[in-house]
Amino acid sequence: MKKFKKWALVAIGMMTLAVSLGSCSDDDNDYYLRTVPNALVTVKVTGDRCYFQLDDQTTLAPGNISKKPFGDKEVRALVNYTMTDRKDDKYGAVVNVNWIDSILTKKPVPCLATPEENDAKYGHDAVDIVRDWVTIVEDGYLTLRFRALWGNVKPHSINLIAHVNPQNPYEVELRHHTNGDPQLRWGDAFVAFD
């Protein structure tokens, strides 16, 4: 019993010491905020530079990017940026881009003659649309975060079939094709349709 009390006192003393010697960091930088995207933009190209269409009214000029990050292609992208004090006469606020990552951006595909042809060409494998801030219709794009089963052996394809209902031109169908990839675990991806 004496040994137990001795070890209990030592353990309590060590815990008290650990709590009392903890340091307080006054490192108040917001570095962690740079690890997540803070905007979904359309990267638009004009001449030898690009700008970001943030929403229907807001454009941003990347101040620290001197070339077009995706060539001459207009794409949707997730971006993490920091505001600056500078202004651009044409594009509004100037931002510093911490990082940018493009989203698969593609056109809708035509509806084929029969549902069987659509199944064969575009697939009919399980896909879920995730309710998220990235799932949005803006700037002429339908941008989706979607969830599917992946095996990472073969590339999957994702398509938006247009004109599936002649009576309703706004009715579309999202199709996922695993292309024979084993469906092992759930994972998310992004796609934007123009």
Positions of PLM-derived features:
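Bacterial Sec-dependent N-terminal signal peptides
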Residues: 1-4, 14-43
